[in-house]
Amino acid sequence: MADLAKIVEDLSTLTVLEAAELSKLLEEKWGVSAAAPVAVAAAGGAGAAAAVEEEKTEFDVVLVDAGANKINVIKEVRAITGLGLKEAKDLVEGAPKAVKEAVSKAEAADLKKKLEDAGAKVDVK
């Protein structure tokens, strides 16, 4: 029984690539196909990637278009970023550009609402 526990422990330390290679070797040795388990493992890998994306904590607020009310958007950009008038105007006229980068989800939503209320089209990435 101790040998089985050691095998389980050794298998637990394998990387995904090593486990896939082990699977291929066992298929060749035993003359079987493990198509269904491989598909389940691939689906598990995709789920892990989706979980990582859901846990994103930093967002960029991107000004896509200033819209018709450019002056209000420039004022709001100045208030948000602390830029001078010329720098804020250049940022607004150079859209699409990031207004703020690496902000929390709540702050990104707040900034998006403020800019949209001023008349801008905003994207959060």
UniProtKB/Swiss-Prot annotation:
Gene Ontology MF term list: mRNA binding; structural constituent of ribosome
An annotated GO BP: translation
One Pfam family from the record: Ribosomal_L12
Ranges in coiled-coil conformation: none
The keyword Ribosomal protein appears for this protein: yes
Membrane-spanning intervals of the chain: none
Keyword Ligase: no
GO CC annotation: cytosolic large ribosomal subunit
Cited CDD domains: Ribosomal_L7_L12
Alphabetized UniProt keyword annotations: Ribonucleoprotein, Ribosomal protein
Family recorded in the similarity comment: Belongs to the bacterial ribosomal protein bL12 family.
NCBIfam families documented for this protein: L12 (TIGR00855)
UniProt name for this protein: Large ribosomal subunit protein bL12
Taxonomic source organism: Agrobacterium fabrum (strain C58 / ATCC 33970) (Agrobacterium tumefaciens (strain C58))
Gene: rplL
